[in-house]
Amino acid sequence: MKKSNIIIIILSLLLTGIVGYGLGKQASSRPVEQTVNNATTFEHWNEDSEALKELIAYVEDVTDENSENFIPAVDRVATFDMDGTLMAELCPTYIGVKMLMERIFNDPSYEADEEMREFGLMMRDHAMDKSFPSDFDYTFSSHEAKAFAGMSLNEYSDYVTGFLLNDADGFENMIYGNAYYLPMVEVIDYLQDHDFKCFIVTGSDRFFIRTFIEGVIDVPYENIIGSDVELEAKDQGDTENYVYEFTGKDTLVRTDKLIIKNIKTSKVLQIAQEIDRKPVLSFGNSSGDVSMHNYTITNNGYKSAAFQLIADDDVRDYGNSSKGKELRDKWEGMGFVAVSMKNDWKTIYGENVVKTGSFHWLEDYADE
């Protein structure tokens, strides 16, 4: 599973030019191995991590056929947020924001209008201190939809693939395509080995995440639920979908119409519509995931749990260690298991990845 993302990216470009749709691990009826060797299964976690112990105890309980808390494999559903839960969001901001900035200011094939450039400048000025306007989550995705409108799905995948080859701002020895949390990839592998069906439920663009996880996170593409833009046939024009007849010569393209921003209660609605089973495990890191957590642990017919990551590592990442206790108290008070990136993980991105302590963000997008 742990193939190098860069190899996958290069092979994708050279051999196919598109991102393929793979199949994930399927549930089986094989007996569950109850003994976990932390040194090999969770080599990126500290062995004394209480959060890890709680996760292992939970899984061993609900996969034991003799336990009163046994959950049949068909109902073992785990949902994961993406940004800040499986991949970096502090270099210096969301990776999707960085890609949109590149599209607006550094892509010669795209001519941003004045309103788009103004939005880009706003992102530039607020990214460093995370002081985005309160409606930023939605307005970002609506501008993202506009910036990539007209691209076919393959063209968009290729664009994302090329962007992911760029060096991650604020780090040495890491490209954006490798900016994922190694300990959390181990969690997905572990759960799938115990017949859990893992879903990524993210506020990021669904197709962006499909490309990002290729060769990194072994989750089937159909198990990715994200923010969506409307698609249409390239030559469809103003004809409604229920009228237009798709032909073998047609190509699907992205439009500038945002269908859904998949955060907060939208995540709950999407889970109900697309999975049709309530999760028994939920993993997130922010207020945007609280609704998904509450949906998981409230009125569930099975034993359930929610895990909330805390970005408190200011040595290996750009977290805020001073807020660690405050956030732990907050999340545990809501019934979630708190995971400290600082104290629970041996590494975040790998020992060779080094935090530089500075960003090129402002100089990259300085006024001309």
Give the location of each predicted region.
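Short, structured coil/loop segments at alpha-helix boundaries
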Residues: 48-53, 68, 93, 110-124, ...
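Electropositive phosphate-/nucleotide-binding environments in soluble metabolic enzymes
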Residues: 49, 150, 265
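A metal-dependent, Asp-based hydrolase signature
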Residues: 91-92, 97-177
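Non-catalytic pre-domain segments flanking phosphatase-related domains
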Residues: 5-82, 90-91, 97, 104-110
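Short amphipathic alpha-helical patches
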Residues: 81-83, 106-110, 123, 214-215, ...
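C-terminal cap/substrate-recognition subdomain and adjoining C-terminal extension
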Residues: 27-45, 60, 68, 158-368
